From Swiss-Prot:
Modification type Leucine amide: residues: L13
Protein purpose: Antimicrobial peptide.
Domain of life: Eukaryota
Organism: Rana temporaria
Subcellular locations according to the entry: Secreted
Keywords in alphabetical order: Amidation, Amphibian defense peptide, Antibiotic, Antimicrobial, Immunity, Innate immunity, Secreted
Family as reported in the entry's similarity comment: Belongs to the frog skin active peptide (FSAP) family. Temporin subfamily.
Gene Ontology cellular component terms for the protein in this record: extracellular region
Protein name as annotated: Temporin-1To
Keyword hit for Secreted: yes
Amino acid sequence: FLGALVNALRGLL
């Protein structure tokens, strides 16, 4: 599930 969280953070950036 870490990948999903990182993906969301990258989306914000």
